[in-house]
């Protein structure tokens, strides 16, 4: 019985640690990769929207449409998770009390808020303009957040 209690406790601790991993400042994650993930999720949402709009006739297609809707929703949620759990809670910080620092901080927050809103709109509709707006707002954030070296690294990931 003690052995099973030990195993259960060990598994509980391990899974808790794995789940909490993204909430600690470990330095494992890469900012540029998070941006690329958001771009990839957005393009998947766009693909889902296009499929949904063009395939709504018979039951077989309706089944596929349902699957694409679920796909679109999941990718939009992933974008919201990356923005809120990674950038907003861990990366975006007020550097100092200067006006320049405060202005940059507010601009970054606004850009990420717009990405969150666009992801929400992608969940609510199949209007592909929302994916365009999402990518535009993401690009605005990239320009505010990354220095020239970071932007170069992003381009190399394409």
Task: Give the positions of each predicted feature.
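Bacterial N-terminal signal peptides
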Residues: 5-15
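Amphipathic, well-ordered alpha-helical segments in soluble domains
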Residues: 41-51, 79-82, 111-114, 118
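Alpha-helical segments in soluble extracytoplasmic regions
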Residues: 49-90
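Immediate post-signal-peptide N-terminus of mature secreted/exported proteins
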Residues: 21-60, 67
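C-terminal amphipathic alpha-helix
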Residues: 112-158
